[in-house]
């Protein structure tokens, strides 16, 4: 006889207050992070309000990109995305499309066709293989890449707050299953963050929205269409209490899919016009991706956009126009498909269109005019709410929840109830799906049921855990399998085995089984966990992450020291060659000595780009020891020689 494990229940967001206050550990300032497929965003609850924090480039959203340069430097965020076209094979993005999934997952197989970097199979999971500089190849788990993005968000918050950040609330799509949620928590651990809560993106958006809408009961529909995922949630908000009534969506629909359609259109068009297939040139495809994304954004506010790419392919330029009408035509089936989950959510919550009080649009893709029009038409002309920046709403809500967990009183009596998005059940004789937890059950939840053996003296039962709505398990999604062994010999149907499913506040499942006859209790490990990182792997990845940070620091120091020597040598060279300045004041002997010393160092630099910090420092000191006495003699003082830094400001005085 067989059973199943719980899906990705939607997280409960329980904003507890005074009763936890006494026993709460000091967690410092907890940050809220929207770890997105394409962009990430971080916020903090401070002085009674949410601050969305800008990164070092001044941007409030950061690309979820990590790159490794040929020089061995690691770039994260804007810097990584900006060099995508020149280094596509070693620029990693869309890690969220791979996290917590198995190699054989059809969506993984579909995705890797379009990713410019190499994805390989390791321990039945997709791993990312890149050249990290110096001819070294390294494979990373998707969790490690996500951890690097989380580290960037953590550092962004630390720079703003002026102190260390150790605890966070991180958001995931409502449809993420157990493995994907666990993998996201693991990414936090690797980044040195204690992820206190995993919360659903639409839930977070509802919190952001709910803060200023506190009177009476309201039905809110959250329509969240981002770069990689689509979620629809129906929430009721009553005096600060949120309840997620129903959710639906598509884990694999978003802005990137719209870009892909446009790219395919232009690749075909280019082949038709020139007979050339650009697909085989990664760099050309990435250039096109970048320009198509820009054009798509422009079309939200204008009716046509020009796509110009210099030396696009084999030295030829690319120049085409994309109209809003063409963009809509290429994606119309995808746009229309977003209405199905909206319909489903209304059916699940027994509500009519007219019962919806507010429609909240979240995610950058909801800026597309056609999407806004379809939503408005679906709700018979009702205008969606525009009170929230769609890029920041999720991080905003996560920051409010983080404020609650920090013990910040200003968030008030905010409570949020969440639900399990799919029915969870087990397989019983004949491949029947026996339901344990119906979809849209509020979590956290715990359900138990008694099962028995299917044959005489059966020592083991195999339990298969499924999620889905179909009556037969073959049509549903297998989440995991485990065995309960050591059942004493008995006729079929006699042993009583109590199986308990428990979903915690993060929507993560625990399964316990108890043989009622013997009182033997076993905690069951779902084989799904085998796709998770082991504690040892996580520890190794944490160490790797620390090592990377250390290497990044060392590399920067080395580059800075090299630059100091270089600018010092060139500054001297320029001044010696300038008759108005140092060149006109030196004796020919001193001039020759200095010129020779400077040339030696410049030649040495050209052939020793990869020297150690100590070598650069030593060479600079050697040069100073030759130059210093000459300059001192010239000025009759023991003042320091001109340095590279002084070059710009002190130049005129020499």
From Swiss-Prot:
Signal sequence extent: 1-18
GO function terms (MF aspect): ATP binding; ATP hydrolysis activity; ATP-dependent protein folding chaperone
Main location, first listed in the record: endoplasmic reticulum
Chain positions with O-AMP-threonine modification: 518
N6-acetyllysine PTM sites in chain numbering: 125, 213, 271, 326, 353
Residues bearing the modification 3'-nitrotyrosine: 160
Cross-link (Glycyl lysine isopeptide (Lys-Gly) (interchain with G-Cter in SUMO1)): 353
UniProt modified residues of type Phosphoserine: 86, 649
Region feature (Interdomain linker): 409-419
Consequence recorded when altering residue 527 to A: Does not affect AMPylation
Residues that bear Phosphothreonine: 518, 643, 648
Catalytic activity: ATP + H2O = ADP + phosphate + H(+)
EC identifiers of the protein: 3.6.4.10
The record's account of how the chain is modified after translation: In unstressed cells, AMPylation at Thr-518 by FICD inactivates the chaperome activity: AMPylated form is locked in a relatively inert state and only weakly stimulated by J domain-containing proteins. In response to endoplasmic reticulum stress, de-AMPylation by the same protein, FICD, restores the chaperone activity.
Record-listed N6,N6-dimethyllysine modification sites: 585
Family of the protein in this entry: Belongs to the heat shock protein 70 family.
Domain notes: The interdomain linker regulates the chaperone activity by mediating the formation of homooligomers. Homooligomers are formed by engagement of the interdomain linker of one HSPA5/BiP molecule as a typical substrate of an adjacent HSPA5/BiP molecule. HSPA5/BiP oligomerization inactivates participating HSPA5/BiP protomers. HSPA5/BiP oligomers probably act as reservoirs to store HSPA5/BiP molecules when they are not needed by the cell. When the levels of unfolded proteins rise, cells can rapidly break up these oligomers to make active monomers.
Subunit structure: Monomer and homooligomer; homooligomerization via the interdomain linker inactivates the chaperone activity and acts as a storage of HSPA5/BiP molecules. Interacts with DNAJC1 (via J domain). Component of an EIF2 complex at least composed of CELF1/CUGBP1, CALR, CALR3, EIF2S1, EIF2S2, HSP90B1 and HSPA5. Part of a large chaperone multiprotein complex comprising DNAJB11, HSP90B1, HSPA5, HYOU, PDIA2, PDIA4, PDIA6, PPIB, SDF2L1, UGGT1 and very small amounts of ERP29, but not, or at very low levels, CALR nor CANX. Interacts with TMEM132A and TRIM21.
Name by which UniProt lists this protein: Endoplasmic reticulum chaperone BiP
Species in which this protein is naturally found: Cricetulus griseus (Chinese hamster)
